[in-house]
Amino acid sequence: MARRCGLCGKGTISGCAVSKSMHHCKRVWKPNLLAVRVVVDGSALNMRICARCLRSNPLMKKAQPRANAPLRAAAPKL
């Protein structure tokens, strides 16, 4: 699976990390992807979206649990 945002398409980029002594090391910057269950057109989908899209897009809301789903009770400790 690609390391890419499902909404904006943000992916990994590569470049050089430059230290204080101007030493260049190759490195990779990766987006902050989160696996989220989102409601799109009335149906819930699993998507990997970046944190910026999740924070900034008011239409992207996490899917709520079903109203008629039974709640799981904690098992008693013995």
Swiss-Prot record:
Gene Ontology cellular component terms for the protein in this record: ribonucleoprotein complex; ribosome
The organism of origin for this protein: Treponema pallidum (strain Nichols)
Gene Ontology biological process terms in this record: translation
Lineage: Bacteria, Pseudomonadati, Spirochaetota, Spirochaetia, Spirochaetales
Pfam family, one: Ribosomal_L28
PANTHER family (UniProt xref): 50S RIBOSOMAL PROTEIN L28 (PTHR39080), LARGE RIBOSOMAL SUBUNIT PROTEIN BL28A (PTHR39080:SF1)
Keywords: Ribonucleoprotein, Ribosomal protein
NCBIfam families for this protein: L28 (TIGR00009)
Originating gene: rpmB
UniProt keyword annotation of Ribosomal protein present: yes
The protein, known as: Large ribosomal subunit protein bL28
Disulfide bridges in this chain: none
InterPro entries registered for this protein in UniProt: Bacterial_rp_bL28, Ribosomal_bL28, Ribosomal_bL28/bL31-like_sf, Ribosomal_bL28_bact-type, Ribosomal_bL28_sf
SUPFAM superfamilies: L28p-like
Molecular function GO terms recorded: structural constituent of ribosome
Keyword Chaperone: no
